[in-house]
Amino acid sequence: MTTPSPSDALLIAGKRYRSRLLTGTGKFKDLDETRLATEAAAAEIVTVAIRRVNIGQDPNAPSLLDVLPPDRYTLLPNTAGCYSAEDAVRTCRLARELLDGHNLTKLEVLGDERTLYPDVVQTLKAAEQLVADGFEVMVYTSDDPILAKRLEEIGCVAVMPLAAPIGSGLGIQNKYNLLEIIENAKVPIIVDAGVGTASDAAIAMELGCDGVLMNTAIAGARDPILMASAMRKAIEAGREAFLAGRIPRKRYASASSPVDGVIG
């Protein structure tokens, strides 16, 4: 039996991770639920919205770092809520200052409040500036294969195409675009946004994605802790299925028991 080995680890910016499930820290009812869900997901990389979550900006308020310490988790500060390259770059620099020179960041520059689709022009502009400034950029983008390749060429360490609009729970809406991105990439491709349940995560991994990032699908579930556990198992199952190789789709039946050698 073949099982994923340590050499199958997710590699981002030179660091290896056992878990291919990345989780967010927003929308939970409190910090304790955030901690429990993160543990149930077995996530190693957790995203933090610098403009919304306290990681030291307010010394008088509870800090996320109290429940998700940086010596145990890789914190991935993100630019959620930014609508221009300038705001995104400024937010990343603030995060680097708060986290003592931490360069890994998740870039997202939104186009409008209704769809939360990425503004690809501003995203490209911000990515170029951040890479030049020494940041290791994981970038949220559309499922456009040409744009994904351009972001890779700029120097982003991971490209994160959406499966569907943020928080929609619609699942993967265009798997053929996603496949095109995966097949032409030389950096990790991590689905970001749109996952609604465990089967969505499994499908993303079966397609060959390197990982999945989610927040609402877990935090918005009736039982976030149980859903985090389900997502962990789905990611693992999807990855194993991808490595094992699915059978070809056929129009007609194919008997599982051969005719040759039938008794009688």
Swiss-Prot record:
Pathway: Cofactor biosynthesis; thiamine diphosphate biosynthesis
GO biological process: thiamine diphosphate biosynthetic process
Subunit text: Homotetramer. Forms heterodimers with either ThiH or ThiS.
Name of the gene this protein is made from: thiG
Function according to Swiss-Prot or TrEMBL: Catalyzes the rearrangement of 1-deoxy-D-xylulose 5-phosphate (DXP) to produce the thiazole phosphate moiety of thiamine. Sulfur is provided by the thiocarboxylate moiety of the carrier protein ThiS. In vitro, sulfur can be provided by H(2)S.
Protein's name according to its UniProt entry: Thiazole synthase
Residues that, per the record, bind 1-deoxy-D-xylulose 5-phosphate: G167, A193, G194, N215, T216
Pfam families on file: ThiG
GO cellular component terms, A-Z: cytoplasm
Gene3D superfamilies: Aldolase class I (3.20.20.70)
UniProt source species: Xanthomonas oryzae pv. oryzae (strain KACC10331 / KXO85)
Record family assignment: Belongs to the ThiG family.
InterPro entries found in the cross-reference section: Aldolase_TIM, Thiazole_synthase_ThiG, ThiG
Catalytic residues (UniProt): K106 (schiff-base intermediate with dxp)
